[in-house]
């Protein structure tokens, strides 16, 4: 018996991967340059406002906003969230002291240490734009000066070479005469002053002793003759 024909199921052919959708090239539109800031950062403006107002009990938020409008001509309604945010963080960090109220409302004052700091100066764009121009012009002037000096140097060298054959009498430096050191004569020792002569006491003239007359010598008595013994 013949085997029945085995039907082979067709193998599904792998369909080619769908081509990825090509990304549309972004239109290179020139980005609008951000409008330059016409005022310094909010933190600097608030610090400057509190310093200039110099209120003993601290400056209120309304007073600070009025100062910002008058000094920097800014829209305080747009800056109010930034003002509140800075006031809260400054109080937490110890950069500001809150004398009244809580949170971002109330009055604020600078601590004693912050008052000594200098007020930040405004930096306008005109000053920053002029600086690079000056920096570019400086090297140009420097190059011209270098070229002029290099061109002049060989001329000076040639002039000196021509003058070399002329023998110049160079004056010999006069020999320094040895200075004889005259020995300083020793000063004569001062003569010793004569010792004062001791005063000799003149002996008083002794009174001449009167010569005593010698006493008359007594004549010796004649020895008695022995009497003749009687027989």
Swiss-Prot record:
This is Histone H1. It comes from Chironomus thummi thummi. GO terms for cellular component: nucleosome; nucleus. Gene3D superfamilies: Winged helix-like DNA-binding domain superfamily/Winged helix DNA-binding domain (1.10.10.10). Residues 145-171, 178-213, 221-231 have a biased composition (Basic residues). It comes from the Eukaryota. It is found in: Nucleus; Chromosome. Residues 38-112 form the H15 domain. The keyword DNA-binding applies. Its main location: nucleus. Transmembrane segments: none annotated. Histones H1 are necessary for the condensation of nucleosome chains into higher-order structures. GO terms for molecular function: double-stranded DNA binding; nucleosomal DNA binding; structural constituent of chromatin. Residues 1-44, 124-231 are annotated as: Disordered. Residues 1-17 have a biased composition (Low complexity). Keywords: Chromosome, DNA-binding, Nucleus. Belongs to the histone H1/H5 family. GO terms for biological process: chromosome condensation; negative regulation of DNA recombination; nucleosome assembly.
